[in-house]
Amino acid sequence: MTKTMLRALKGETLPTPPIWLMRQAGRYLPEYRATRAQAGDFLSLCYTPDLAAEVTLQPIRRYGFDAAILFADILLLPQALGADLWFETGEGPRMSTITDMEGVTALKGRDDIHETLAPVYETCRILARELPKETTFIGFAGMPWTVATYMIAGRGSKDQAAAHKLKDTDRPAFEALMDRVTEATIEYLAKQVEAGCEVVKLFDSWAGSLKGQDFEDFAVAPAKRIVSELKARFPGLPVIAFPREAGEGYIGFAEKTGADCVAIDNSVSPEWAAEKVQAGRTCVQGNLDPKYMVTGGEELVQATKRVVEAFRNGPHIFNLGHGITPEADPENVTLLVETIRGK
């Protein structure tokens, strides 16, 4: 097996960690901005396979990352389930809201999502053909809790108050929504794998707002179900899980869910994560602060070396603790890659 990303996901400790970045296809790159302008708007970019494939390939051409991640959005799935989705300039995504069981039952079934998502699968097929042979191809979806927070509130929020309210005041409706999203997520990811994705990543951006038993019930349990069903269909499929800002919840997350790798954010130190999460055997992905992609210089070099050093005694995939920001300097990403690869 020559793909370093897949070797790390199988538990191999490598002298140089594979590297890719969350949101590596993004607004910090001039070529991305040009292609997005060509598409007209963000959703059109997601749903135009040739252009979505192009922006996926751009950071691979520029930096030679070890992995490419499908260009899409976690909110395409709720749109396929029947939610209205639009993006407001400077405000981010907006959706129609689900606040009761009636709203849940009005959603499409898990087998009815594929017509809307067909362009995404075509993007996967294009990339499976066009990516360099050494580049691992990652598909992804949002985790049910995070997707549900948007479906309930109609927008992102700092505290996910609307989702917590539904969870605490109408548990049957909340659990029914989680079930519908979980089932659809499994089918969505299965189609991505059938179309050529070699790895899938589960993004639980708002997992940190789940505490105690709620974290077990609505972050761990859905991840375990998704991982087990996908691995039953695709034996050996590597899965990366990212329960962002889980803190102590990162400990044992891979073991509890069956994920092959746990991605961690930069609110925890690499040394803590190496001891408590990686523990010499569990593949960890992360966790450089994205701010260094803006500031650059010797600070970036030293912070990068610290992350590499912390995780060098176990399987590690180098990434940021969160997505690269539009303010990042493309030259700083070059410096990052050169620092890791010792160029």
Curated annotation (Swiss-Prot):
Reaction catalysed by this enzyme: uroporphyrinogen III + 4 H(+) = coproporphyrinogen III + 4 CO2
One GO term under biological process is: protoporphyrinogen IX biosynthetic process from glutamate
Record keywords: Lyase included?
A: yes
Domain of life, source organism: Bacteria
* Localization of this protein: Cytoplasm
Which pathway does UniProt place it in?
Porphyrin-containing compound metabolism; protoporphyrin-IX biosynthesis; coproporphyrinogen-III from 5-aminolevulinate: step 4/4
The UniProt entry, under PANTHER family, shows: METHYLTETRAHYDROFOLATE:HOMOCYSTEINE METHYLTRANSFERASE RELATED (PTHR21091), UROPORPHYRINOGEN DECARBOXYLASE (PTHR21091:SF169)
Subunit structure of this chain's protein: Homodimer.
The task this protein performs is described as: Catalyzes the decarboxylation of four acetate groups of uroporphyrinogen-III to yield coproporphyrinogen-III.
Put simply, this protein is called Uroporphyrinogen decarboxylase
Could you tell me which species this protein originates from? Cereibacter sphaeroides (strain ATCC 17029 / ATH 2.4.9)
